[in-house]
Amino acid sequence: MLRKAISVFTLPVCMVVASCHKAPSATPLAVRSPDGRTEIVAGRLKSGGLAVRIRHDGRDVIAPSEVGLMPDGEAYGPVEIEGSQQITTANGGEASHGELLVKARERIGGKRALLLRLRAYDQGAAFRLELPPEPREGNIRLAAETSALRFPRDYACLAVRHAKYLNSHEGDYAPVRTSALQGSALYDLPLSCATGRGEETIAITESGVENYPGAYLVKGQSLGVALRLTPLPAADHLASILPRRQGLRTGWRTVLIADRPEQMIASTLVHDLAAPSRIAHAGWIKPGKASWGWWAGVKTSGVPDAGFNNPTYRHYIDFAARFGLPYFVIDWGWAARPNGDKSLADVTRFRPGVDIPALSRYAAARGVRLWLWTNWDAVGRDMDHVFALYERWGIAGIKVDYVYRQDQIAISYYHRLLAAAARHHLMVNIHGAPVPRGLERTYPNLMTEEGVMGAEYNKWSRSATAGHNVRLAYSRAIVGPMDYTPGGFRNTTPAAFKVRHTLPQVMTTRAQQLAMFVVYPSPLQSLADAPSAYVDAAGHLAPGSDFLRLVPASWDETHGVAGEWGRWIAVARRSGKRWFVGIMGDEQRRIVTIPFDFLGSGRWQMRAWVDGGKPTDTAGHWGTIREGTKLRVPLAPSGGAVMILDPA
């Protein structure tokens, strides 16, 4: 039941004028996190607009900010807050939180209703706007969402800039002050920012987007950002069209909050805000590592005439079986392609020299299953027909590529894709797509997503630097699974690095490539390099390959252990009783101190792989660790380290 609001606090219109007077005292509509540290507050600006404010430890991380919608081309005018309803925290595995539903209505004109739903978690806060269903025909034609997020000071952020809506969502999370954001640019999610109050860090993103477009951020009117919805492809002036009887819900406008920047990578907030699983029986979904032939250029020693053919694919399958990998990803090139056009690939037929059912049987006999690359448009023409065929072939999963969109139609496509794939017991990896919005909770068969400037950029650029790799751990990696495809073993220095498309190099040490398997979350981890990079013809393992055989792809517990924002990071993840630690550094040589407070009581046997004398070398160390131990670890330029800890 809605309770009548006795009074409504008024928020200053600081986003419009340079100075403002203190708001009059009143009773706000607010909800706190279970630990009491985070509070999200609803109220009205002096202009009458609906607003939110987010506070952490009693101080603003998001200053009073107007939120709203523009349905049918008309923005909401001044509103009255009619009441609110406290929502009991849901059960069923959802993280504990406080929730408040606020009901507002326009004072004049159409007196349209507008709902504002607030949530506060220990890891941050979120809000979403809702238009209630109407008992009449017709559509809601949404022109824009007018929400903004104002900052109380000039934050230092990591941001990816795009020039247009249609893009691969790949780029460098470059350092930028909010005051220096470009007015004409679209900024991708997440926007990760140091607030300037100690080591406190926040990140702005979204979750739970359905029947609604994905959002970008743009420079706000003052310090801060505003939301910019991706328009429908055939109507630049429209963001969404929905039946009035259905109503409308925005995505959750999400703010992650952490006391220290490295703690952000352990956040589950984006996942927790998404809708619960819609797959009733998910026992067939199996995380794991995969061999993969595309990055090296389908070139490997030991295979005459290596290329898009059965002998080459069998070689990768044999390697996966010997190396203990449950999967082999067959990337583009296997399907029949009329006129050689990838977008016209017939993903139900294979090219001459390739026999997918035979390869699937060959792999199954060796304990390996296949993933198949598909073009998003080709597979979208008749999903159930294509996926039923793949199920008969024994395929484990699909890699869907070249979407490049996050408009309302594309968001609905992702939901349809994952639901159809689940009906046919197929796991999914989405490429050329936006960053995660929590869909892996709603559809657990979504194993990983791209939306990252990953290892492939070594094939044609100098962009995948160690500094970029570290910044990913403080930005893109904090919102969900990330298919960076680590494991490049032709390691060299930035000065010696040469761009080449076949058998590419990487400008990090071997140990940094190993650390990515711990630092970057991805329940499907594809080993980028050719089999010959990991094991030579005599069966000898390359330095670090022994670690790759041991590291899992899924985790039971995660801690951001230590770091310096954008410069280096240490992450600990637990699988069963075993802990793995990954450390990554930028181009600077340094010695870092790693605390082991995350360990339980007792003694732990440690094995470590650290930077060796050359980029391709690792040095091994063994020892005994206790809870509370601190280790000093040297990092070479563009370096890293990994550790495995077992109960003694």
Task: Identify the role of each PLM range.
Residues 564-601, 641-644:
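Carbohydrate-binding surface patches
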Residues 17-19:
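C-terminal motif of bacterial Sec signal peptides marking the signal peptidase cleavage site
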Residues 623-648:
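C-terminal beta-strand-rich structural cap/linker in extracellular carbohydrate-active enzymes
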Residues 1-10:
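Bacterial N-terminal signal peptides that target proteins for export
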Residues 245-327:
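An acidic-aromatic substrate-binding cleft motif
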Residues 497-562, 566-575:
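Glycine-rich, aromatic-lined ligand/substrate-binding cores of catalytic
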Residues 24-277:
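N-terminal accessory beta-strand-rich subdomains and adjacent acidic, glycine-rich linkers
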Residues 332-509:
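Aromatic- and carboxylate-enriched substrate-binding clefts and catalytic-loop regions
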